[in-house]
Structures are given as C-alpha cells and as structure tokens.
C-alpha cells in the first residue's frame, strides 16, 4: 500500500471518528443542542442539579399537568408554574422531549444501541419522556392505548437496562 493511500485512509478514519463523536453527543435529544432562536433556553438544559431540584421535579410531575391539542405541556398550579425551574421544565417538555409516537420509537431504538451509561441530562429527559408517555397511555383508548403502552414499555426497559449497567460492580470501580 502506498503512503498516499495510507494517509488518505488515516484522514478518512479520523474524520469518521470525529464526526461520529459529534453526532453521538446529540443523538438521543438533538433538540437540546439546537435551541429555537425565540427561546431563552440555554444550550442543553438540565433540571436536576441538587436534591432540592429533584424534589421540585417530583412536585412538578405530581402537579396537575395539561396537554393541549398541539401537544403543549403546561402546569395548572399557578404558584408552581411561576417558579424559575418550572419555566425550565416547561421549555424542556415542550422543546426537547419527543411527544409523537414515531419520535418516541426512534428514541427507544437509539437507546437500545446506546453504548455505555447515559449522561445525567439524557437520563432526566428519558424519565420525562417516560412520564409523558405514561400520561398519554392513561388518556388513550383502544388501539392507541396499546401503541402508547408499547412505547412506555420500551422506554422503561431502556431505563432499567441503564440502571442495571450503572449499578454493576464492573462499571462503578
């Protein structure tokens, strides 16, 4: 093999590795890395950075949530909805997590092929997607309920698989 061919091969493989690293960064939730210009949402936002914020997230999830016909998620409790983290919750739920069956199935397929342990922000978004899917499953009827339930099961299995991987002794050492 000539040195020119070897050089081209090395450059090509380096380009492939660089491109795949950049792609995998946003593969699960590409919208988190492409915020809309009209939003004041930071790039790749995260809700939970402390125990208090985890408790607030549970409070937001337990509050009465409303989903409009255009799939816009809002919190009915005005006091909770006025909090700064509730605004982040609203932005993440309405601009980042998938809300249509094909998008949720795509996320499940990407999770099945995801190497390693999920990042904190990806785990958080998958959990929010799981909560959204459970909510839609409860509201649906007939064949639609079965489709939403299957999506719910797929997401749950992916999260469980990630938790099992992250708690195994080989990973934690």
UniProtKB/Swiss-Prot annotation:
Transmembrane segments: none annotated. This is Protein FAM180A. The keyword Secreted applies. It comes from Mus musculus. GO terms for cellular component: extracellular region. Its main location: secreted. Belongs to the FAM180 family. Keywords: Secreted, Signal. InterPro entries: FAM180. It is found in: Secreted. PANTHER family: PROTEIN FAM180A, PROTEIN FAM180A-RELATED. Residues 1-17 form the signal peptide. Pfam families: FAM180. It comes from the Eukaryota.
């Amino acid at each position: 093999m000539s040195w020119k061919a070897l050089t081209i091969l090395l450059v090509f493989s380096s380009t492939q590795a660089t491109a795949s690293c950049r792609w995998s960064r946003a593969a699960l939730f590409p919208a988190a890395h492409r915020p809309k210009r009209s939003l004041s949402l930071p790039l790749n936002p995260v809700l939970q950075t402390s125990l208090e914020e985890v408790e607030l997230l549970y409070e937001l999830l337990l509050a009465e949530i409303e989903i409009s016909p255009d799939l816009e998620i809002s919190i009915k409790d005005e006091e909770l909805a006025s909090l700064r983290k509730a605004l982040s919750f609203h932005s993440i739920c309405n601009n980042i997590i998938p809300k249509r069956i094909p998008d949720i199935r795509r996320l499940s397929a990407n999770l099945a092929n995801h190497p390693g342990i999920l990042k904190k922000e990806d785990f958080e978004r998958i959990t929010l997607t799981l909560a959204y899917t459970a909510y839609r499953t409860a509201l649906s009827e007939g064949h639609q309920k079965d489709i939403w339930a299957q999506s719910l099961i797929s997401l749950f299995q992916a999260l469980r698989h990630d938790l099992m991987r992250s708690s195994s002794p080989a990973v934690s050492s």
